[in-house]
Amino acid sequence: MVKIKAAVCHEFGTPLKIETIDLREPITGEVEVTLGAVAVCHSDISFADGDWGGELPAVYGHEAAGFISKIGDSVKGFEIGDRVVVTLIKSCGYCNNCSEGNPTICEDNSNAEPPILSMKGNTIQQVMNCGAFAEKVVVDQSQIVKLNNDLNFATASLLACGVITGIGAVVNAAKLRPGQDVVVIGAGGVGLNAIQGARIAGARRIVAVDTNGDKLTIAKEFGATDGVLATEKSPWRIAKSLVGRGADIVFVTVGNSSVYDIAPRYLGYGGKVVMVGMPKTGDKSVYEPVMMAAVSQGMIGSKMGDVIIKRDIPWIVDLYEQGRLKLDELVSKTWTLDQINEAIADTKLGSAKRNVIVFEAKQAS
């Protein structure tokens, strides 16, 4: 066991507490990663607020980067000192979905011995297989991707969730074709990356929709051709007038069920809604199936951009190195672990692209 600092949730909807906890050694197939940075994602906030349930106490955080500091047995392709991105995508490699190239929806829910414990020896939940609001994590080797460049950890951490979720939703889930028109509802961290993905994939028009005018301005910097305030009366009509028709694809990147109610109104004939943002457990949306079926419209879900991390993350990094993709600009502000509750409060205001917690991780030379 090694002692580490972590931000622990003991009660939903209350500030996280910085505590010293125990982290066990990595076992077969696992690695210990000393973290350099972890981003604050709205999913972490939803869990901490109790929107999706779960057991407590718990450590959240799933969008991280650092270097490997210990390696368990049977780990292949990684060495101590390797700089890596740490994701929540734990895959067995053998179930039907993994065998078909869909590791984000791996069917194997079995878990190893819990890696984190309180100082009294009680189990602490490692949420989303990461628990990265901490100085170190122990994760499965399937969750990490090696970084072969000197990308700083704050920027690299975003590759673990927001970037791959947005870009992957466009390229992998929607399979956008050059010349298609898209609407992206929500111009936050994931939405901006959906916009970047649409630009890279060759979309003709990219319409960003958000309640915040400043975020629409930022969306255009990331590749949106147009912006529509969601507070306007019938914003879907404005979007259609800008495009000249309904959209081929609408990406919903916010976790609000009322947004899902109106998302199909942006569609053209044969279009589809891609569900990316996740509302609270139990929230419902209402549709008119006859209207969608009559014009061959549809809806699909996209978890973590349907990515294969060892394929997609290196590709995305290469685009960044070529200057074709913005990553550094996604970091709104950096914070320390002791400031995590302030970072969460700032994220809840809705103006940040991504707040990132940085650690003083010192890698042996």
Where are the language model's segments positioned?
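C-terminal hydrophobic helical "lid"/dimerization subdomain
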Residues: 1-4, 237, 249, 261-265, ...
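Residues located in well-ordered beta-strands
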Residues: 5, 17, 22, 34, ...
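Residues in the short beta-alpha loop(s) of Rossmann-like NAD(P)-binding domains
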Residues: 12, 212, 279, 305
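NAD(P)H dinucleotide-binding glycine-rich loop of Rossmann-like/cofactor-binding domains
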Residues: 23, 92-185
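Glycine-rich beta-strand-centered segment in the early N-terminal region that forms part
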Residues: 24-38, 48-99, 104, 128, ...
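Mid-domain Rossmann-like dinucleotide-binding core that forms the NAD(H)/NADP(H) cofactor-binding site
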Residues: 83, 142-144, 148-233, 237-238
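Glycine-rich cofactor phosphate-binding loops and adjacent beta1-alpha1 units
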Residues: 174-178, 190, 201, 213-298, ...
